[in-house]
Amino acid sequence: MIKLFNTLSKNVEVFKPIDEEVKIYCCGVTVYDLCHLGHARSYIAWDVLRRFLIYSDYKVKFVQNFTDIDDKILKRAKEENSSMKQVSEKNIAEFHKDMDALGIMRPDSMPKATNHICNICSFIKVLEKKGFAYARGGDVYYSVFKNKDYGKLSNQNILEQNINQQGRMTSDESNKKNNPQDFALWKKAKENEPSFDSPWGKGRPGWHIECSAMVKDELGETIDIHLGGADLIFPHHENEIAQSESANNKKLANYWLHNGMVNVNGQKMSKSLKNFTTIRDLLDSGTSPMTLRYFVLTVNYRKPLDFTDEALKSASEAWKTINVALSFFDITKKENLSIEVNETNEFVEEKYKEKINYEISQKKIKFTNALNNDLNTAGAIAIIYELAKPLKNFINQFQRIKNLDINTNEKFHLRETLKTLEELTQVLGLKKEEIIIENKITEEQIISLINKRLIAKKGRDYAEADKIRNSLKEKGIELIDQSTELTTWVRL
């Protein structure tokens, strides 16, 4: 059974869906710029959750919004001498490019705030009618003190928040708000800014109300899972709960899941610290999409993820092992060794077959148990690595010993291991990438250097022999001395 940490209860709970179809809402991006590593961390984690639910035979409807009207978008439009729509559409296209590269499944629906203005206005009218909202001079605010449960997600103290907010209000806000903690549902239009018609005059929606309206319109009044980063717990998700539950008299979501933040070399990632990295910058610098995905999955989604060059390099090396294993058939076919998946198992010894099937079933159970345990991707990755190692080792051995004798039992073991590896990596969204050999060196060049090294050794020029060995290792070639006269090699 799947167990998830619920931010609302502060406990790990058994997941029990409302209906046959699991309804999930994920807070999307404000589309004014390229996505950064924090977005990668969040959307990779939730993509694995979605994939695992599907793997566990659940039907899933996954909705993720776009905030396409916001102060940041308007500011960017002004800087670029463009329009709000042009900025948002451009960055939506860039968002898809990044997410597709990382192997993130596209949501079933991706509503935009600007397409839900009528729904948003209707939602606010309900809150106003019930006494949870009040209009002042073209603005509409939510009255926090009317909601006795406000703060239940974040454990915020309303009175303390009220005091803290008093010094942050503009003079206009202090004249309009009943209390400093009250937040905007509708904002009066400013001169020369895009606006929409509403019962309170021209304006645009507040950030929080957008999600409440879109959740209801896309998924209904109560959903199974609501997702987002830990930075959204307060005020965004707290305010979503307040709005939705006040309007609908129903629980907004049964499970609230939040991912941890990204640090860079132990410091919070931010533009002010100049350690801010976009997904595009990282991929353009040579990091493969699956290396980044693998790196994100090595740490539990709720914990902070510390991004360092060393950690990324380590992830790259580990991913190479898995990627080579996933490329098993491509490599063995190139070397004219046939170990096809559909090859007959007729001549495999029954006891051997039972042994291998049992071992693989145990690995699948461990993999599933890891993800059942609050999406423990690090534990799942460990099982993936266990499956990849024997495949990688066989390739190394095969490249070293060209006429390697392999029996039907061993072929069966390799085929079943690869089939399982492909199945489980798909759950984590890890997919085979082209193997790029840096400083590529041909077989003829390798043999020539091996012969030169043997001559150097015979002449007791061990410094030259070591120099050749180290030079080949830098090019990804490891030498294995079988005897004083025979040296074989393998690509690392």
Curated annotation (Swiss-Prot):
Cellular component GO terms held in the UniProt record: cytosol
Annotated InterPro entries: Cys-tRNA-ligase, Cys-tRNA-synt_Ia_DALR, Cys-tRNA/MSH_ligase, Rossmann-like_a/b/a_fold, tRNA-synt_1_cat_dom, tRNAsynth_Ia_anticodon-bd
Documented EC number(s): 6.1.1.16
Subcellular location: Cytoplasm
Any Pfam family matching the protein: DALR_2
SUPFAM superfamilies: Anticodon-binding domain of a subclass of class I aminoacyl-tRNA synthetases (SSF47323), Nucleotidylyl transferase (SSF52374)
Biological process, per Gene Ontology: cysteinyl-tRNA aminoacylation
Motif annotated as 'KMSKS' region, chain positions: 268-272
Residues reported in the UniProt entry to bind ATP: K271
Cofactors, names only: Zn(2+)
Subunit details: Monomer.
Family per record: Belongs to the class-I aminoacyl-tRNA synthetase family.
Protein name as catalogued: Cysteine--tRNA ligase
Organism of this sequence: Prochlorococcus marinus (strain MIT 9515)
Lineage of origin: Bacteria, Bacillati, Cyanobacteriota, Cyanophyceae, Synechococcales
Gene: cysS
